Amino acid sequence: MTTPYKHEPFTNFQDQNNVEAFKKALATVSEYLGKDYPLVINGERVETEAKIVSINPADKEEVVGRVSKASQEHAEQAIQAAAKAFEEWRYTSPEERAAVLFRAAAKVRRRKHEFSALLVKEAGKPWNEADADTAEAIDFMEYYARQMIELAKGKPVNSREGEKNQYVYTPTGVTVVIPPWNFLFAIMAGTTVAPIVTGNTVVLKPASATPVIAAKFVEVLEESGLPKGVVNFVPGSGAEVGDYLVDHPKTSLITFTGSREVGTRIFERAAKVQPGQQHLKRVIAEMGGKDTVVVDEDADIELAAQSIFTSAFGFAGQKCSAGSRAVVHEKVYDQVLERVIEITESKVTAKPDSADVYMGPVIDQGSYDKIMSYIEIGKQEGRLVSGGTGDDSKGYFIKPTIFADLDPKARLMQEEIFGPVVAFCKVSDFDEALEVANNTEYGLTGAVITNNRKHIERAKQEFHVGNLYFNRNCTGAIVGYHPFGGFKMSGTDSKAGGPDYLALHMQAKTISEMF
């Protein structure tokens, strides 16, 4: 009998005891920086000459780890190992599979600060963001374990006299997991354990920018009793290894989180039936957003400003849920803009060595260059009112940047930047606000700051996003509380951390017995 699910509490860094504990965790992680990590194929460690070098984006001189780089030959071995392991793992009871997740969650919880400290080093996350990332990883394991125990019963269907009908779920097969670097622990862990607990086997190709946390998590799964071959760890390039895994005829399911460009490419490649393939592949994809915070004319100014700031600049705007657009009613536009500038300029952007750092670096040189190029575009399209500068001499640091007076069709209002840049757009009424909010190809998250009940009810119907929030920021979805996934080009609306998610990894089977 399991206890009811509750999300993992966040660490209070106002408590000096927690600060000291986290400093110790950072020291612990520092002791194993630069370590080599092998591939894991069928439970065996495989060292390769080629390496993926993970560096600290806040300190380019600091190597977090060197991870063996897989070739197509390794990818083939991993697929075969997963296919072989599937024949036994699929028949392991759901309760036993769930028990692996419960044990893994407990192990991560006991080392929570250590894992969070690794996220600070590998992704440049501020302490509170790293802590939330680790908490979410724990949540995915706890939530999906409980969900699988419930789904093991199947769903009720009708039976006529003289027959017994059942509707049950069965595993799908080999799952290729391609997670992102931004939620390097939470999404990587969640998309790995969901197929595992549903009876599938996994080939995990982690993000090349952040492979060390994935290697550490695979160790946790093995220590938690996961049999060999159920998870296989093959870091490698998307072009060489990623495409090979997606195209493979033994791949049944692909779960991907990342850019629209890569996601649509995977969707297209997965649709092609390869020689020897005996099934249609499924794709679970989350592909980003261009998310909007709408501020109504009667909004609380402080709440609106805090919501915009948090949505835009948490983890340097490197979230698919980031509120990179502020659509504000003309009556309160100047007040809200001024207050967001004040809040932003009061915060610390630096190497995340202490709890008071609000924003750290962006992930790498490519991201830095892309974001800085968008800032130049913004200078042509709007009015730069804060930030706009960067420094990549020691790490990849960009000041939180605010542009005002953007046209709704401007590039800064339409294209995903994935950095600390927010664009303000003035509207004359709520009709126009909703029109602008819906005018992109994405539909992931959104927020409305208002005290108008009619406008709230209308936005529920007409603001077309997968995750809609009122009178709060549009980031920070919690597993089991705010199932996460978007519409349109934001993905397949596969709600991670929700009651429907595990079923996407399984096949429904109808069984009818006469007696």
From Swiss-Prot:
Origin superkingdom: Bacteria
Keyword NAD assigned: yes
GO BP term, example: proline catabolic process to glutamate
Record pathway: Amino-acid degradation; L-proline degradation into L-glutamate; L-glutamate from L-proline: step 2/2
GO molecular function: 1-pyrroline-5-carboxylate dehydrogenase activity; proline dehydrogenase activity
Keyword NAD recorded: yes
Catalytic activity, reaction form: L-glutamate 5-semialdehyde + NAD(+) + H2O = L-glutamate + NADH + 2 H(+)
GO cellular component: cytoplasmic side of plasma membrane
Cited SUPFAM superfamilies: ALDH-like (SSF53720)
Active-site residues, record numbering mapped to chain: E286, C320
Xref: CDD domains: ALDH_PutA-P5CDH-RocA
Enzyme type, top EC level: oxidoreductase
Family (UniProt): Belongs to the aldehyde dehydrogenase family. RocA subfamily.
Protein name as it appears in the record: 1-pyrroline-5-carboxylate dehydrogenase 2
Biological source species: Bacillus subtilis (strain 168)
Gene coding for it: putC
